[in-house]
C-alpha cells in the first residue's frame, strides 16, 4: 500500500449541461427577474398610493375651515414641495386687470382675498371672491365663494362634471347709503379700516352679555378710561390680520355706570371662586347717523367675538375688576361716512371707577391700557381660538348659541332676535331708511337721548345704590333671569321719569308683531331709555358668526346666500313663523324682476307682483321711480335665445296681468320681463346729408365715444376695438379703382346689376344695361337719409383683401338680416359675394365676419366651400367664395320634381360626413356649431359642400366662452348645449343625425318634412326644450332600414359619449352603400314612388305692357341704325300669327327660336347673342350649353346675323336682301327649342306629334328633371306647382276644333308640318308679306314673330329669350304671372 501513489486530480472543466437543463435554468432566471420587477412595481405603487393618500388628506384639510394654527407669522408652514397651480384672479372693476397666483391644495378663498386685499386699486378695501360661470341664454352668473372653500376643489369639481373652468373675479364690497354725507373733523382719525368699503358696523354691544370679555393686546386694542368723564368718542379699532375684527369707531364696549348699577356679573374665574364683576352698563343711546332709528342694522364684529375670552378664565390669580367708565357715548355708533356731533346735554355725571384692565392673548393680563384714540397695528397673526370645556360661557366662534327669546322683553322697539325665528337685522329693513322706501324725517331715523337734568341724575344715583345691594343675589341667579330683572327695574325707572306714559310688558310674540306692524310709530311715540336701549341692542346683535377667520359679516342679506327659513338660530315655533310672515300683505303673490333698458347687466327692479298687477301698474311704478314722463314706458316679455342671436319679445298690453302672462309659458324660467323707454323720433332726419356737406360738424348725439382709444396702423388692433367710431376718417392703402374712396361717398347701387364696375365690349348692350339698372332699383332697400356708414378702410391691410375693381356684380341671389349675397365674377370665374353694410353691422358681426374669413382661408377641401378673399370698401365688407349653382340641400330636398333616390342619398351624406370629419381632424379640432341643410350647398357637378363658418370655433381654452353659447337652428342643436355644456365634436354629430333623418324621410316618402313637424311649435326655443327636457326626437319612418335607423339613433343619443365619431359614421355608410349596390331592388322597394311626371306644355304669363322703348342700336355691319321699334303696343285686340306655318297665340309672350344645326361656324352663334348670354350658359345649371331638342324633320335654312340676332327664313325671298354681308347661312334640318334659364321667358316646343320636352340624362342613365331649373337663390323664385289657370291643350283639340285657346296662357304646338300648315293658313293668310316694322300692329299681347322680319331690334324677345338677364322692356306687366311647367300624370 505504501508503494501506491495517491490519485492526482486534474482541473478539468465540468461537462456541459444538457440543453433542456440550460433552458430550465434560463427560465428560472427570467422568473426571478420578473418577480423582482413585480415586487419593485408593487413598492412603487404602494409609494404612489401613500402619496395620493397624503395628497387627499391635504385636500380634505384644505377643504375644511383653516385655523390660525396653519399659519405662523403670516407664512404658510406647509411642505414647500407641495405642487402648485397657477390661477388668474380678475378685478371686477377693470377687465384688463388681473393677478396670477400660484396656489397649492391647502389655499382657500380667504387666503386669496386676504393676499389681494392690499393690491387692489383702493388698498384696504374689503373684497370678496366670486366664481363666474356660464348660465342659460349666454349670460354670466356670479356666485360668492365662502372663505373656507378650496380653490383647487372648485376647479376640480367642475372638471369632473365636464364643465368649463370658472373665472375667478374679485369684487369690492358695495358701499351703502347714509343720511348725512358730512364727516365730523374730530372723528376723522377714528375711521375704521373697513368702513370705506361700506361695511355695516354693529351698533349693538356685547352679544352674550358680560360672559364674553374682549381683551386688548397687540391684536385687540380695547380703550378703557378710569375716573374720567369722556364725552368724546372712545375709539378702539381692533383689526385682526386674520380674523378681520371690525370694531366701531366709537367702541360700544365701554363699561358705563350711569347711576343705574346694571351689573352683568361674569363668573369666569371659577377655580378661585372670585367673581370678576364687569359692570358692562352700555349706556349707548345709539345716536348714530347710519340711518338707524332705535333699530340699527350695523353689527360690530369685535363685540360679537368671543374667541379671546379664555384669557380671563385661565388666569391663576383672582382678579375682581369693576369697570365703571362713565363714557356717555351718545354717538358711539357713528359710521365714518356720516358723523353727528354729540350734544352737550348728553354728557352725564362722572363717577369714580377702578383702573381698567385689559386681557391680552396671554396668560398674564396687560397692565398698560391703550390710549383712547390708539389703533395698534398687527404684526403677527393672533393664536387660534381656544375652547374651554370647564366654563359654559367660554365658547368658540362656531359654537355660539343664539340668545334667549325673551332677552328683549319690555322694550318698546326691540329688534327681532334670532331666537324668535325672525329675519336678522338688516339695512334693508330699517324703518324709515332710504332703502326701505319710507319718507320718514331725520328725527325718525336718529333717536337722541333726552336731556339729563340734575334731578334725574340724583334718581339714577339712588337707583344705582339699590342695585349694588342686590349684586350678590343677582350673581346666584341664571343669566337670563338677571337680564329680566334688570329690564324690569329699568322699566320702573323710566316710568317714574315719564309717568304720563304707561308701558305695558309685552310678550315676545306681541313684541314682534308690534314691531313688524308699526315700527316707525313706536319710535315716534316712546323714546327708549338709554340703558334699556343698550341692552336691547346687545341682544339684537346676538347671532352666530360664520367664516373661517371668525370675521363677522355684514348683516345685510347677501344675494348669494340661501335664506334661512327657520330664522337666525332656532327653527322657531308656528306662531313665530306666522309673526314673521305677517309683515307681507296677503295679496302679494310673487317677487319678479323687471329689467330696464336693453342691457341685462344694467338696472332692474324687483317688484312684489299681486294677482291683479297689470303692465300699466308696473310702468307707472318704474316711471315714478326714475322720474320719467307718464306713459313713456312699456313692458315686454322677452325670450333671449334665437338662431340668429337675436331675442324675441312680445309687448304686453296695459291691461294684461303680469302673473298670467308669466305662467302661460311652458317654462317660465326661460323668460323675463323688460321695461323699455319709448324712444322719441329723431329731430333731424337729414343729419347724414348735413354731415356729408359739413363733416367737421358732428352733433353730440351722433358721436360714438372712443374713450381715448387711438387707432393703430396694425389691422389686428382694429378688430380688437370695442366700438368703431362712425365719423372717424382713417386713410388706408390706395384702391386700384378709377376714383378715390372717401368716407362720405355712397357706394353704387349693389342690389340690381352694378355694371359700373365692369364694361362690355359690345356696344349693343349699353341701353339694356341702363334699363336693367333702372328696373332693379327697387331691390335696394338700404338707401335712406338716416343711414350712417362708418369707415372700414383701415381693414384693407388684411391679407385676404381683394380690390373692388376686380369684382363684377351680376345679380342678387339672396339676402338676410345683416347681409346680401350676389352672384358675380372674379377673374373670369363665377363667385358668390356676401356683403355686409355699415348701418347693419355691429362689433360682434364684424368679428364673426373676420373669424369666418380666417377659417375659410385655412381650410382646403373639395367638400368645403372655397374662399377667394374679402373686399373692403367704405362702410361695406364683402366675402368672395365659391359659387354653387344648385343652391342649398334644403331647397333641393323641397323640389318635388327631383327623384331623390338612394344613390343621391349615399353620395351626399358621405360627402357631408367627410367634410365634417375634415374639420374635426384639424389640430385643434374645429367645431362647426351650425350644421343644417341650409348650410350645405350643392355645386353644379352635384357635390355637397359645407358653408357658413361664421359660428365655427376651435376647441381651445380661448374659445371657452363662445363654445358655451347656444347657437344654430334649434332643431339641429344638441340638447346638452341647452344644459350649459360646451360645444364639441359630438354636438356636430347630433346635427348630422338630424340631417340624415331629413334626407331619409325625403328619399323614402318622396315628400320633404321638417324636423318635429308633428309637434305644434310656435317658437324655435320650444324645440330645444323638447329635446333636452322631454327627450323628444324626430320620428323615424317605419320603412327605414334597420342599420340606418340604428345609426341615426346613435347620432342623436342623449349621452354625447355614446355618439359615434365621423370615422365610425363614414365606415357604416360605406358598408351600407355596398349592401345597397348588391341589392338595389330591395332598397328601392321601400321607397314610395311618386307618379311619373313629364313636361307636356309650357305656359307663360300674359303681358299688357304699354312701354315705348326707343332703343338706338349701333350696328357696325348693317345700316339699320335708326329703327324705331314700338314693341308691345297693345290696344286691346288679340290676334294670332304664324311662324313657319305654326300657330302662335298672340296672348302670350312666346318666343320661337329656330335652332340651327351644328357646324364649324357655331362660334358665331354665341357672338350673335348678348355678351352675357351664351358664354354665360357654361355655368348654368339648366344646360351645359345651348340645349337643342330636335322634334321635327322640317326643312329650311336660317340666317343668323352675328350682331343683330335676327332670324331669317330662306323660304321667304323678301328677307334675303338686307343683311347678307356678314350673315352665315346654316342648314336647319330640324326645328327645336333652346331652353333658357330665364323663368320669365317662354319655352315652346315645335315638332311632330306628340311633342314632349324630355329632361337630359346623366351618364349613368338616370333622369334629372332639376337640370331644367336654376338653383340660385333669387328673391322671387317661382313655384314649381302648376297654376290652376293654366290648361293643357292636347293634339285632338287642335285638330278637331282648329284653334288654340289663347285666353288660358297656354301654348302647345303639336303635329306635323302639314297639319301645322293647315292651322297656320286658317289663321293668317298673309304670312309672306314683308313687314319692316316688327310688331307694329294695333293689337294687345302681339309678341309673335313673323319669319319675314328683317328688322334689327336689340330689345327683341328673341334675344332676351336666350339671354341670362331678362329684358324688362320685352316682358313687363302690371300683374305678371309666374311661368310654370305643366306636368301630366301618365299612369
Swiss-Prot record:
Residues 807-1072 form the Protein kinase domain. This is Serine/threonine-protein kinase phg2. The keyword Glycoprotein does not apply. It is found in: Cell membrane. Residues 778-788 have a biased composition (Acidic residues). Residues 81-193 are annotated as: Binding to PI(4,5)P2. The gene is phg2. ATP binds at residues 813-821, 834. Residues 1-76, 175-336, 350-447, 501-578, 729-788, 1077-1142, 1158-1181, 1194-1227, 1319-1348 are annotated as: Disordered. SUPFAM superfamilies: Protein kinase-like (PK-like). Residues 55-68, 1077-1087 have a biased composition (Basic and acidic residues). CDD domains: STKc_MAP3K-like. Residues 668-775 are annotated as: Interaction with adrm1. PROSITE patterns: PROTEIN_KINASE_ATP (PS00107), PROTEIN_KINASE_DOM (PS50011), PROTEIN_KINASE_ST (PS00108). Pfam families: PK_Tyr_Ser-Thr. The active site is at 930 (proton acceptor). The N-terminal domain (region 81-193 aa) interacts with PI(4,5)P2 (phosphatidylinositol 4,5-bisphosphate) and PI(4)P (phosphatidylinositol 4-phosphate), and it is the responsible for the recruitment of phg2 to the plasma membrane.
